[in-house]
Amino acid sequence: PSAATITAASHALIGTGEPPYRTGILANEWWRRDLGRSLKAVEAEDGTMTAKWLRLPGLSDAIAAAKTGGKAVSVSLKDRAAILPLGHAGTAIWYDARRVAWTSIAPSAWLTEWNASHPIAAHLHDVWTALPETPGLARVADDAPGEVGEVGLGPTFPHALDATRNPASAIFATPLGNDLVFDTATEAIDREQLGADTHPDLLILSLSAHDYIGHGWGQESWESWDAVLRLDRRIDQFLGDLDAKVGAGRWAMIVTSDHGACPMPESLHGGRISFAQIKDAANRAAIAELGPGEWIANARYPTLYLSRAALAQKPRDLAVAMTKIVYALRSFPGLERVEKSADFWGNCETRTGDAFLICITLDPERSGEIVYMPAKGWVLEDSDEGVATGHGSLQSYDRQVPVIVLPPGRTAHAALTGPDDTTIPMARIAPMLAGWLGVPPPSSLRAPATP
């Protein structure tokens, strides 16, 4: 329900039930003028991982506050995807590619044992090959236009991890990454004794590999289809494990996505824009009013941050320069909506349409001075990286995602009536889960003390 169709912002929304302007998590990272650099959404100033930038309680905080005896655990390849949906309590587990091991904010004895008994390094020579069914489902060439590969893996199968510069990082963009998440989640069920008593527990899995695969090869690619096939089979296995360990009908689940994705730009007559191009165009527009200088500090989506030098200009000169930047970026190919952020601060409830979505995405303390959105068929990329496709726009393909709800008392393999077109706002997921857990929704709790 916001314009921030980005991993960190959406995971915070799923776990709190509140949009970015309330959670404070407006993107995967944002510019810190006091530090002179970007800071990740779950990164402390010293580089350690933290939930302190999340202004609101999450589901784990609701469980802790209710004192039900329930536990909360999350597992993901991504740190932000493990930490933010939980909140400030619970056990968040993610993959640290530098250590080639699982890690968490607080030490965990069983996780240390798990890393030792099931070392991820043993997989660094794995080779990802396509399943026999994959080509027929994809219906495109293995090396379709726009595919660039990801984290050192090339455009075509097979994909050998040890053929990359950093096999440990290449794990992120293969089905192996999801398999490792499932394996660790299954171990967490046993070691944390999840579902072993009458106190409802929470287990969150964020299966991030398909996101990386989409960025590198696109949603229509062999790689994407192959990953989905393998994921479907692994989910089936995991649900069977839940039946065996917890008991059929004794667990409930919601399956959804933090965001959608743009089809390959080549299919929509779109294209790709780098953040460097946006920054350069904005700086040229500022120079036309303010003269030579570095007037733009950062242009990472969804907002552009002016430099300290720009903000030190006389108010009238700064206002004119900002207007020129806005008009320059509006004429930039691939950008659909460019506005001054201050025009969207406050009174979000009175706004409608895109204006409402932009309003609930921005944070006066953390957002930049200018907000911009890519047009249909256009995606944003790092100039030194390159992507096949991406997400992070107002477009329906980014904002509308499937959701599967299996309420308490239902069994996973029972016949379903089939999909329908019922719309469930993402903000309803946290209250729904809280109700199942027998705890107050996170939004009803007092916010934690955060910077």
Q: What do these predicted regions represent?
A:
Residues G70-S76, A82-I83, N178-Y212, V371-Y372:
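Active-site regions of oxyanion-processing enzymes, predominantly non-cytosolic
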Residues N28-T48, L56, D61, L86-H88, ...:
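Secreted, luminal/periplasmic, and some membrane-associated catalytic domains
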